[in-house]
């Protein structure tokens, strides 16, 4: 959740409030206490999922939940849902989305334990429900309408090694520029 909070604060500085909810005790309170001094965005530690989801434009789920907890009512206000964790969302909630975008499909459809891929293997979500891959959107070979409360978009991040490689490349370039680290001959 910490990395998602950092990403939101960086990519969406115009957000007026971010509610943080945790399935496990006071983790959300510690996260809010650590990041509130670093931002003008109001951070709140929501006591319940219902409170966190109420009025939220964007919902990001990043847990290791073994059973889904996000129901259709949690998505009433949301226009974008980012599924980064394991098994957070019910099939009924997935049915609320106009578009579903995945970072990868082929590599994940038969092996991932994430909600979307489970429902696909169970025959509850068909391939026709997948609007695009992230790559196709970035390349401009596919488009989807802008997300809104009436046109909800789900993004499922299975997680590709290419992202790890990309981040490693950036880290190495920065380290070289700052003359940090040790050169290793391969």
Positions of predicted regions on the chain:
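A general structural motif
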Residues: 15-17, 78, 97, 151
């Amino acid at each position: 959740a910490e990395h998602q909070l950092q990403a939101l604060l960086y990519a969406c500085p115009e957000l007026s409030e971010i509610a943080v909810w945790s399935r496990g005790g006071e983790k959300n309170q510690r996260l809010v206490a650590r990041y509130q001094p670093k931002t003008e965005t109001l951070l709140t530690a929501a006591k319940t999922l219902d409170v966190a989801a109420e009025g939220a434009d964007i919902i990001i789920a990043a847990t290791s939940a073994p059973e889904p907890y996000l129901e259709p009512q949690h998505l009433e206000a949301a226009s974008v849902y980012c599924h980064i964790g394991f098994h957070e969302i019910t099939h009924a909630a997935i049915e609320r989305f106009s578009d579903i975008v995945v970072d990868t499909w082929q590599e994940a459809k038969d092996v991932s334990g994430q909600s979307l891929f489970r429902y696909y293997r169970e025959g509850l979500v068909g391939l026709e429900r997948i609007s695009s891959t992230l790559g196709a959107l970035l390349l401009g070979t596919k488009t989807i309408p802008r997300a809104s409360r009436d046109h909800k978009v789900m993004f499922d991040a299975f997680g590709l090694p290419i992202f790890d490689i990309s981040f490693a490349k950036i880290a190495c370039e920065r380290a070289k520029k700052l003359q940090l680290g040790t050169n290793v001959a391969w």
